[in-house]
Amino acid sequence: MYIHIGFIKNQLRLRKHLPTMQQDVGSILKHHRKEMGLTLEEGAEGICSVSYLSKVENNLIHPSDKYIALFEEKFKVDLKEKPSRLEEDIIDFIINKHFYDEPIQVDLKFMSGLDYKSKLNQLMYLTITNQVERAKKQYMELMPYIKNLNTKELKLFLYSMALLLTKEGRLKDAFSVLNLDMPYKMDCYLGCLMMKMRIMLATKMNNHPFILLNYEQVVAYLIDHEYYHIAHELKYDYIVYLVQFITLENLEYMLDKSLHLKDEQKKYVLARYHFLNGSYEEAYPIIQGLELYDINFYNLSIQILNKIGDKEALKKLISSQKYKDNIQMNLMSSYLNEKYFSRRLTTTSFIKNQIMKINDLPDMIDQLHFWYEESLENFKAHGFYKDATQMGHLIYRKIRDLSLTEY
């Protein structure tokens, strides 16, 4: 299932009026109407006008008692008001746990209602707990209810979608979705999480203007409000970003001063430095045994192993399929599997079809460099100079586009 960013933007444009009611009657009515396959006209037939039902479903008005009785009869549903405090408490609980990076344990039966708030809670929970396919199905169920969301709920929806897109490897789309919530505000936990994610994505895409304009003031804000754990995460992302621009001496000095970094994080930073500087034999021993620590370690590990030609270790990593939900990691793993093991396709055929034609180029700068080097090496070896030039132009434009992302 593909998540279309344009569809989300169009739904937000249709959101002309903010909901004035917080009851769940409207979204429950909409759920049952769609379950029965009825249009607005068919749902309102014999009860009220189409515009009246539309306003009820979008939480702009509350139906009078005489209409509620008719709706209950037509849709075979109980529309008596139920307290919605539980759903709001669950939202706050999930956000607070996620903000402090604590395990989230919630029984899904508490989020099994037919109203939009329950659907939103399920989307956030499934996304945070890495249930990507179920989260994508929940997204499709929630989309018709965008008009029902208040400002806080819309922020939660956009953040959930950005998380989901990031897990798929669609970093630029995730960044664009976060920027649908303008202007930037960090006046709550959710606002801080959204800004943290923007900067994290910017560091992976080499979006230099956004980093220069926002990083220092965001970290200062987080420290002033004693959100030290978030500030430390951003500092780690920033050091990983800086690795490509500084000397080893300066890097080691920064790591010595960064007492908040975990040992694993320091190892990743050093390994990435050596990899970017072509010292592949020095890079791999640093992260050996940590290849599956997280997706960044995995991405770096398979690229290093590809460079040093360690087929046994590479095959073990590829066969783990730990990050199968990430489109770009899947492509890289499939390519390396074809290159070294299955050999059903030539490397040039794979790059031409899967990278240049069928799939989007990656948004992570390291993965763009990977495809640039692999395509030039293979195309030139086979005399496909036109394809090599075309791929170079595509990647150059992609890198430029990522560094100039609107914000």
Residues of each region from the PLM?
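DNA major-groove recognition helix of helix-turn-helix/homeodomain DNA-binding modules
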Residues: 64-81
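Short alpha-helical DNA-recognition segment
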Residues: 36-55
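Alpha-helical residues within helix-turn-helix
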Residues: 31, 41-42, 70
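Short C-terminal boundary/hinge segments that cap the last helix of small helical domains
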Residues: 76-92
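A short, Lys/Arg-rich alpha-helix, primarily the initiator
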Residues: 2-35
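Extended amphipathic alpha-helical coiled-coil/heptad-repeat regions
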Residues: 116-401
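Alpha-helical segment of the N-proximal tetratricopeptide repeat
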Residues: 89-112, 121-134
